[in-house]
Amino acid sequence: MSVFTPLERSTLEAFLAPYDLGRLRDFRGIAEGSENSNFFVSLEHGEFVLTLVERGPVQDLPFFIELLDVLHEDGLPVPYALRTRDGEALRRLEGKPALLQPRLAGRHERQPNAHHCQEVGDLLGHLHAATRGRILERPSDRGLPWMLEQGANLAPRLPEQARALLAPALAEIAALDAERPALPRANLHADLFRDNVLFDGPHLAGLIDFYNACSGWMLYDLAITLNDWCSNTDGSLDPARARALLAAYANRRPFTALEAEHWPSMLRVACVRFWLSRLIAAEAFAGQDVLIHDPAEFEIRLAQRQNVEIHLPFAL
């Protein structure tokens, strides 16, 4: 189970008292998280999620709180930070920054179809449209420079076939980092995977886990999303799902010619980002009772993205 900081009931009760949400009925750790400690918390006046932030600089947390407030006010189904009776949103518990948020209804869709992908494309387009006019600036702590540094560190320990796949991808990232093309920007979720979306029946009911959110190219966020939601088990893209997601997104925000040009490379960049972070996590948490996602999943996807046949609607 991915709970890095266990909690005693009495400690949690004292923490929850200032929210005036009634007595604590029950709480349990959430196994799905891989970076923070998350708990389902059942109180007299509702169901909530408590997050203890285990990774990242504390100074970034006000950014996440403000971004979620902006998205909530624009009608997106996101978990915003609740305030105590004194107006505090960001607090500390067991020495860690802590946030209490409403628990959203729904479940994760492990085997999405074209309808689910259409809903996700519309959601991502809404998120970008809500923030592109007034971007809350925060560079990603796992952006292009991070990929170049970590890729160089990890490459010597990889098998020859993996190194041969990674090397040209890192060269492509270096070129992109040097060019910094003028692609349209907004705030990004930057981790919009299946386990961060909730469906209530056929309807998308929630988008969670914003702790990788940042500002940047919208195309990169779209590539991250499509790589997870529209990939087959062999790493290839499913055309029906991919086109449904892209069409729904484009209804919210049309693509530019420059985005169409950079689309294939952005899909590869998005693969590298998660291949590297999963390799790092697999080394760091080896032998521990922590959820570790398989790095090979993105190695396979990167291999499949050497030829991209699913183009943006602009380029059809």
UniProtKB/Swiss-Prot annotation:
Phylogenetic classification of the source organism: Bacteria, Pseudomonadati, Pseudomonadota, Gammaproteobacteria, Pseudomonadales
InterPro entries, alphabetized: Aminoglycoside_PTrfase, Homoserine_kinase_II, Kinase-like_dom_sf, Pseudomonas-type_ThrB
Keyword Electron transport assigned: no
Disruption outcome: Cells lacking thrB are still able to grow in a minimal medium without the addition of threonine.
Assigned protein family: Belongs to the pseudomonas-type ThrB family.
EC numbers: 2.7.1.39
Coiled coil segments of this chain: none
Keyword match Hydrolase: no
Any one GO biological process: threonine biosynthetic process
One GO MF term attached to the UniProt entry: ATP binding
Native organism: Pseudomonas aeruginosa (strain ATCC 15692 / DSM 22644 / CIP 104116 / JCM 14847 / LMG 12228 / 1C / PRS 101 / PAO1)
Domain of life: Bacteria
Pfam family for this entry, one: APH
NCBIfam families with a match to the protein in the record: PRK05231.1, thrB_alt
Enzyme class: transferase
Keywords, ordered alphabetically: Amino-acid biosynthesis, ATP-binding, Kinase, Nucleotide-binding, Threonine biosynthesis, Transferase
PANTHER family tied to this protein: AMINOGLYCOSIDE PHOSPHOTRANSFERASE DOMAIN-CONTAINING PROTEIN, AMINOGLYCOSIDE PHOSPHOTRANSFERASE DOMAIN-CONTAINING PROTEIN-RELATED
Catalytic activity reported: L-homoserine + ATP = O-phospho-L-homoserine + ADP + H(+)
Pathway where this protein functions: Amino-acid biosynthesis; L-threonine biosynthesis; L-threonine from L-aspartate: step 4/5
Protein's name according to its UniProt entry: Homoserine kinase
SUPFAM superfamilies per UniProt: Protein kinase-like (PK-like)
